[in-house]
Design a protein with these regions (language model features):
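His/Met- and acidic-residue-enriched segments that coordinate or traffic transition-metal cofactors
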Residues: 1-60
Length: 60
């Protein structure tokens, strides 16, 4: 599947956002002292990593 320049640009923007969110929630999980909160932040970080991986696969 051939992607247009606009599509590639959008995917790259989304990759940057997902990478930032993954790092942000991972950092919050590391800093959290409450176990439940730490688990939630970790799960959110993992979900954003999955989104990143899915988007990255589109680039081939």
């Amino acid at each position: 599947m051939q992607l247009s320049e606009k599509e590639l640009s959008s995917i790259n923007d989304l990759l940057s956002e997902e990478e930032l969110l993954t790092k942000k929630f991972k950092m919050l999980a590391e800093q959290a002292t409450d176990t439940e909160l730490k688990d939630k932040f970790t799960n959110i970080s993992e979900r954003h990593q999955q989104h990143f991986n899915s988007l990255y696969k589109l680039l081939g």
